């Protein structure tokens, strides 16, 4: 039985997004592209090629293993690895920073030559392979201090430090030692941290001059300081210098007087501080790189691997003799030393007349079989007459138009050289990813069209796709977006997003090319409306409506008459305006409603009131319905809440308008608030809504329910039935009867006394 390996799947949200995209593309039995069919066929082939297991439970085990492969494993929330390129989401809001990187320490007289140097004039002597030895690694702390200058004084603006490893080594040629720094990242200082109040213009900004000091201190390593960089202290120096510090407190320093003076790459003399107040120069230089970079470039360069000892660099001391090879000649001859050519070694003549200079006469010389220049690229000649004619008249061929309609050069027609790979062109470098992975979040995609649709979720950047078959596939150029509205946070304003069900299949190729008809067809009438937060609205001044110009009777060949009085109208006179009488229309609607026998009187009453209000407004579009609906509620609020049946009919009307997507939800909420206020006013006035019950009468007995075992006389309770009363109620009734009898006796006595 073979072991089933688990494959890392996509995250939950992105997996659902891909599933929804494929589902919308298949609506109406329409596939989005041929790439989707190829992916399905590949999955089918992989499923059929899976070996079957033996045993009775083989089918169940196969299903379980398939489910394990399909299930995506959880991605760790805290991880040091980042799949995508470290781009800043808030690119526009970040400021530039000063980046200072300590590169190496080398001797001031040490020359630098690359490996593989050969002597001129075809001597054939190659350089010896580099054998780095005596590598010493020392733990140290690198401290950076930035000073600003004002009134001739130095002001400390920024101090930072980090631990690092100093690797001291020398090559086999016996050159001076060299130092490399490991496990140390460049210092990145935002420009706002080194702002200074300038003297000339009284502006708080960057100063005209900055000086940088780099100090290397001991980090508890017993090997400090490096013996190769600092010569040992003699007894005479120790005797005459009483203030000499212990060796573990010695500090290596390098100072840059002004970072604006020279280029970015700076070589500064290394000094050693053996005393508390003075230092002395050494024969070594510290190379530093100082430049202004954006945060994107800073993070991109930080991802580079730590610099190690490169075997391609050979440093040869001109004072030391050149080491010999095994067969005797010199190991390297770089056109002499200090520009002076060394004499050629004497060559012994062989019996056959050939010279032995390290190469055989039968072997071809280097570069003899290679062309001296690149081959001429011939232009392909097109012999298609139809295509030549289309190019001459400026007409687009059918194949190109179909390709552009399906996605053009960025569609699914171009087979990538590498399976689902793509290259991103960034300002500092290039990044190559597989499986159409997103550059920012690292999400993988099935095809290129899905990747282009996915990048619409990152509006902070613009992505320009280009297909280069000679370069090896797809190339994407990434730039910060030029839309200032999205940078300033315009998209953070609260807006209504109303989305409905899709009405047609999703053509992903057209969508990524800019055709948003599939999205706009789903948007509701309230989409894009700004939501005014409570308390932030600015009261608007009432607008003055301009006075309408009076309409005059035009001058025509035929006379015009008044529609009511039939009087002839003279040209130039004001046109008479008669009020519109809609009473006949209301009467007609009222008669038509009375003809319906399946409507209750309450329904007819509400419909007549609604028609009488809405027909007088002469609404020509559904856009004006919400405002007149609110006006109807405000005017008829007391009438609507006076009866329960009117409220029920009003609810039916609201449900109908909501189902037709004519009435927005905010209008319904406002209308409900108006009706609630009307009900509150009605209760304050002491009115009762008709149709509501008067309320259950308060019972005199507080304990009206008894168990059978708690009744003192069950037989009497069965005989009396509903007229049976408990003991407390019987006592109360007897007391009430006695009080009534006493009142009757008192009234009778008063009547007798009066008579």
UniProtKB/Swiss-Prot annotation:
Residues 30-42 have a biased composition (Low complexity). It is found in: Nucleus. A zinc finger (C2H2-type) spans 436-458. InterPro entries: Polycomb_protein_VEFS-Box. Residues 26-79, 333-377, 392-420 are annotated as: Disordered. GO terms for cellular component: nucleus. GO terms for biological process: chromatin organization. Belongs to the VEFS (VRN2-EMF2-FIS2-SU(Z)12) family. This is Polycomb protein SUZ12.
